């Protein structure tokens, strides 16, 4: 969430920057938060004054008892009882005001970075660069048809077992998922990421920490009081919640391959066929926890790490900077990597790399000691490295020659050095 003191001191600027998101007008919510924060400060001043008076009286009572001034000490005790009642009442008022502030803040998104492109939707995103790779085979068969023809995926049985937007990888399809995940994790390990094998179920505080809750609750799968992860960004970023890290341990870089789960509540009618939009999907995630002054440089390196995956497979792709109206809730700045799908004749997102600045860190209370031993919030970044199902779909469409799937060279050792699947 945002820093309430920054909001209070820079209200007009915060309103202006948030309104660039083109999602809603946050003016009333922000003014409400500021007014409640002033109320909170008033309560704290009153409470501290009462506590100070109570402490003073407690000392006086001891002195009065020593001097055997019983009547005066009894009067002081009565005043202490009254003060306690007032303090309890103020504490309850403070709890209510804090809850009111938190309830609003948790629904207010991160500030877009000051140099971000202004735009209303994904149509206003800006292409930064394209790869030099091209679709060599020039065939345009839908990936789901190729997957079915080769027996790599059973879409019908996925629906039979679990419903729409579920699938089953079979035979060489299962091996394809496993080999790609292994390949990606090894690559990211070489780039300094530490592999984590993390839980697929997390508690509510973890979801609050990264900003999935409360705003996106309808998109989450809930298991009792816990949640299936929508991405391993959630457990990886929360690894250091409520911790104060030493200066020299940063940056921390984590990677994980997991299944991810999303309701896709707002995606009715979109990508109903194939492997692009699933309720359960496979992804290799990249997370960084860094010094604030290094976060923008770390974002550029994060993009390069994700690009490296697509370059490994010689897939055509482009890098797009998201405009102010398209960035995610917790993000200050985001770049998408989009891979070419010849059958659709367009680029589709396969990785999203974001700098969340101190937005998530404030929720999680993940801090570090700077060189002067001052406690500060870290910055957090995350990116797909990459979405495995979408990568497989892109390989199917870009490496299909009309009769067989040409296996990318670096995958062949996993398939007994065979050159194609037919």
UniProtKB/Swiss-Prot annotation:
| Residues annotated to bind L-serine | 231-233, 285, 384
Q: Which domain of life is it from?
A: Bacteria
Pathway entry: Aminoacyl-tRNA biosynthesis; selenocysteinyl-tRNA(Sec) biosynthesis; L-seryl-tRNA(Sec) from L-serine and tRNA(Sec): step 1/1
Under the heading InterPro entries, the entry gives:
aa-tRNA-synt_IIb, aa-tRNA-synth_II, aa-tRNA-synth_II/BPL/LPL, Ser-tRNA-ligase_type_1, Ser-tRNA-synth_1_N, SerRS_1_N_sf, SerRS_core, tRNA-bd_arm
Q: Where in the cell is it found?
A: Cytoplasm
Q: Does the keyword Nucleotide-binding apply?
A: yes
Q: What EC class is this?
A: ligase
Q: Name the UniProt key words of this record, in alphabetical order.
A: Aminoacyl-tRNA synthetase, ATP-binding, Cytoplasm, Ligase, Nucleotide-binding, Protein biosynthesis
Report which reactions are catalysed by this protein: tRNA(Ser) + L-serine + ATP = L-seryl-tRNA(Ser) + AMP + diphosphate + H(+); tRNA(Sec) + L-serine + ATP = L-seryl-tRNA(Sec) + AMP + diphosphate + H(+)
MF terms from GO for this chain are: ATP binding; serine-tRNA ligase activity
Q: Which Pfam families match?
A: Seryl_tRNA_N, tRNA-synt_2b
Mention any one GO cellular component term assigned to this protein in its UniProt record. cytoplasm
Q: What does this protein do?
A: Catalyzes the attachment of serine to tRNA(Ser). Is also able to aminoacylate tRNA(Sec) with serine, to form the misacylated tRNA L-seryl-tRNA(Sec), which will be further converted into selenocysteinyl-tRNA(Sec).
The entry sums up its family as follows: Belongs to the class-II aminoacyl-tRNA synthetase family. Type-1 seryl-tRNA synthetase subfamily.
Quote the record's domain comment.
Consists of two distinct domains, a catalytic core and a N-terminal extension that is involved in tRNA binding.
Q: How does it assemble?
A: Homodimer. The tRNA molecule binds across the dimer.
Query: What protein name applies here?
Result: Serine--tRNA ligase
What gene is behind this protein?
A: serS
